Amino acid sequence: MTDIGPFGLVILVIGLVGTAAVLSNRLSERLRVPAPVFFLVCAAAASDLFPNLARLSHVTVQRVVTIALAFILFDGGMHIGWRRFRSAAVAIGWLGIAGTFVTAGITAAAAHFLFGIGWRLALLLGTALAPTDPAVVFSVLGRREIGGRTGVMLEGESGANDPVGIALLVALLAATGSPAAAAGHIAVTFVLQMAVGAGIGIAGGRLLLEFMRRVPLPNEGLYSLRVLAGVLAIFGLATVARGSGFLAVFVAGILIGDERAPYKREIERFHSSLASLAEIVAFIMLGLTVRLRDLPIGNAWSIGLALGALLAFVIRPVFVGLITLPIQLRRGERLFLLWTGLKGAVPVLLGTFIVGSGIAGASRAYEIIFVVVAFSVAVQGGFVPTIAHRLNVPLRTIDPEPWSLGVRFREEPEGLHRFRVSRGAPAVGTSIEDLPFGEDAWVIFLIRHGRLVPARSDTRIEAGDEVLVLADPAEVPALKKLFTARRSGHRHTERRPAGASARKEPTTDSDHTGT
């Protein structure tokens, strides 16, 4: 038998690093510094101290981060869901596409005219730095959740501009010939990737949902693995068909997010954990592939810091801000949305594409991307809570609820509905016996501040309560009106952000607890 000591040491190191990465989220909450900062800095320092760690090829990083990003986008799509996405679909699409093009163009112009970078490399660099990452924002906020339209826009913009940025970079890398021919090729390639990706995402999401509903499996754990395999299949099919696999899995996640299916909660928890792991892996990969001692060479430090500052203080607030003017947002919400365009895992992936292209100066561009991402996460991310408070962005603190009440049903419980009581709803202050229910409706459970409250006849409903009601499905519209405040202006819901928790907390839509 061969000596397994070295292999055991590798496993031990991986386990310790993983534990440290998870615990860093707790430290991040205390210091108000995004957890990805620790991943970046520690990995970069480790690559300097242990040169063998820096021998990862960019192809390896590209493949690993590609898979990681696919899971991140699918989880993000599930947490948005179709109902929330539909309420802001036009705004999300407009900001995701137009915002990406404007950010890429202005950043490329700044890189060319201010720092003398050639036009082709500048365009690639600008495109790589265009996508945003709301998961970094949510890691800074910790247990505080963004409410209203702002939260939907943050998640939706990132899910939209990630595939757009990737498709645009791929089109730029494939462009050859005269400027006119290259522009035409870029346009055709981009439109084809978007159309094919969206089409396969819709079809694949529907097929996967039917598969989840109609084909029972012998083991509970297999349900989550089936969805994981489905995500990989959708991504692979879209990629083989010359479409955007990232857009395909994001769209599939949106379609599945609001739907009912067996073991849906377990599936959501599994993919939320998988997305968190994927984000950790992506940032560690970026850190390991950059050596801090090499950054001063070629002025990567100074150029990266300058571009990071321009993106944070000029390009996004001013130029992307003009794009948001047609979108109905309060002034504070608009400013917060513009500040929170943080950079994350996608620039890592796009940087590996640039290096893999073999274009002159690609390694320098990758180092610049590292500095910009580090600046964005540390500086912009560090001020997110303060700016949210100053701009009166709606936030609510989510206390941890580690204990769950598991209830299993053999058949789909169509008559069991869950509602979160909105502030100002007609039911607030009303005792259970005085609720204007029909004869066939009963309050089964009442959950308040994470604790079970006896559902007695004299128990009064309070804002924020979770109410489980047994009623005929036809009663659902009336029940929604009873537990939901009448709002003026845009309609919005609140739900946990991607990566924060897999348990959903709808405010205006019923959630069937047996699914």
List each language-model region with its residue ranges.
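Transmembrane helical cores of multi-pass secondary ion antiporters/exchangers
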Residues: 1-401, 409-411, 462
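Short, glycine/charged-rich beta-strand-loop motifs at protein surfaces that mediate ligand recognition
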Residues: 309, 417-422
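Cytosolic Rossmann-like ligand/nucleotide-binding regulatory domains
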Residues: 350, 423-479
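Residues that form generic nucleotide/phosphate-binding pockets
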Residues: 390, 435, 482
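Long, charged amphipathic helices and adjacent flexible linkers at domain junctions
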Residues: 396-419, 489-505
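Short, compositionally biased
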Residues: 459, 479-500, 515
